[in-house]
Regions:
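Bacterial Sec-dependent N-terminal signal peptides
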Residues: 1-24
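Generic domain-boundary/flexible-linker signal
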Residues: 15, 201, 225-227
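ER/secretory pathway lumenal C-terminal domains and tails of membrane proteins involved
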Residues: 20-186, 206-403
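Short periplasmic/luminal acceptor-recognition loop of GT-C membrane glycosyltransferases, typified by
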Residues: 189-201, 278-285
Length: 403
């Protein structure tokens, strides 16, 4: 009995130590957690800060943990200046004024009274103070923020190249992004929801100097005057002026979908460039669904119908590099998007199996079936609670294409 009690106490102590161990706080798109985890991490990093108030890495993680906890629990409330995140900013201002970590953090959250931070002035300061050992995620963040507020700045390319060299995005995301980029027509416009999707493509352009003819446009950036001004200049078209208030009065809560759609259509018509979208665009905007066609991993705008299946099949056969998806030793990394990326391939490409068969190309049909089957296999093994149900659904989806 005594031995059992000792063993249990040892186990409890070990678990307690692990629970209190400070861990790097990553973006939730890479690795998300429950609010309780962020609260515990905030306590752990607060201890590190107390031990060494000049430790910028500790402050960085304390801020991120606190910010995510507030974000996921409604901690900002009606007045974000009274939140715990705001308190961390104030303490950093007192302890580490004009520091890299303070300016980096203000890029993610700033007091409503801080007009300089709201303008983005802190982004330039963070870049000026950027340490050589800055983590890849933070370099990528600064690259995206600078791209948004000052897209013609030479440091945009330098930062994206630096983030690429440090390999923040997993290789499979980079390959997925490269496949999409290579399939676009010359001089194309590519719209996607936010910089988390577009950053890998921008890295490929800047670091590898590939497909720099393509103009990548995060939809959220359409609301930023400096980005729009630079974009219209690049496309050699007149700037567009829209009254946001009119959209709010007319469309209510969905005003932004119509506002963004009108900007997108203006850019398409005035630039006369081939235009593509990420596959989630239809749920994010008020674009005409009948004018958007699937070409494999991307959607294309076309005012007239055309044989988009031929283009999609060409992309699978000649453009996309998909063999890595079938490698037996390919396993999921820690990123939250791993499973989603596999399922994107299955959902978007499965119907092409039957198209290849009907065209008499049995080799490509079997090749695509083999690749997508591996995607399903990985996805199912990641979710044991739903294994049989999910496996049956996706296996039937793929097998149905062979009939």
């Amino acid at each position: 009995m005594r031995k059992t009690i000792v063993m249990m106490l040892t186990l409890v102590c070990n678990l307690t130590v692990r629970a209190q161990q400070a861990e790097t706080i990553e973006s939730f798109i890479a690795n998300s957690h429950e609010p309780e985890w962020y609260a515990a991490q905030a306590e752990a990093w607060q201890k590190r800060v107390n031990e060494n108030p000049q430790d910028q890495w500790a402050w960085r993680n304390l801020f991120r943990a606190t910010c995510y906890h507030d974000q996921f629990t409604g901690g900002w409330g009606e007045n974000q200046d009274e939140s715990r995140t705001a308190d961390i900013i104030r303490k950093m201002e007192a302890t580490l004024p004009n520091s890299y970590v303070l300016n980096l953090s203000k890029g993610r959250f700033c007091l409503t009274t801080d007009s300089a931070a709201r303008r983005g002035d802190n982004i330039y300061k963070a870049i000026e103070y950027l340490p050589e050992d800055a983590c890849a995620e933070d370099i990528n963040y600064l690259a995206c923020r600078l791209w948004c507020i000052d897209p013609d700045n030479k440091d945009v390319g330098n930062l994206f190249s630096g983030a690429y060299k440090k390999r923040w995005f997993p290789a499979r995301i980079m390959q997925f992004s490269r496949n999409m980029l290579l399939s676009l027509q010359s001089g194309a416009l590519y719209f996607a929801n936010g910089d988390a999707v577009t950053a890998p493509m921008k890295m490929i352009q800047e670091a590898l100097k590939e497909r720099q003819d393509v103009t990548i446009i995060p939809i959220s950036y359409l609301h930023v005057e400096s980005f729009m001004k630079a974009l219209c200049k690049r496309l050699n078209i007149d700037p567009l002026s829209l009254n946001v208030q009119n959209y709010g009065d007319k469309y209510g809560e969905d005003w932004y979908k119509h506002y963004e759609s009108d900007i997108i259509m203006y850019l398409i018509k005035e630039s006369k460039r081939p235009t593509y979208f990420s596959t989630d665009i239809l749920s994010l905007t008020a674009l005409d669904k009948d004018s958007i066609y699937n070409e494999g991993l991307v959607l294309k705008y076309s005012p007239k119908p055309y044989n988009n299946f031929d283009v999609a099949m060409h992309n699978v056969k000649e453009v996309y590099s998909l063999e890595y998806l079938a490698e037996p030793d390919l396993v999921y990394d820690s990123w939250e998007t791993s499973e989603m990326l596999d399922m994107n391939h299955v959902t978007l490409l499965a119907n092409l199996i039957s198209k290849f068969r009907k065209n008499g190309d049995a080799f490509q049909a079997e090749r695509l079936y083999r690749i997508l089957s591996k995607c399903v296999e990985r996805c199912v093994s990641k979710n044991p609670k739903e294994t049989e149900k999910r496996k049956a659904y996706y296996e039937n989806l793929l097998k149905g294409q062979l009939q």
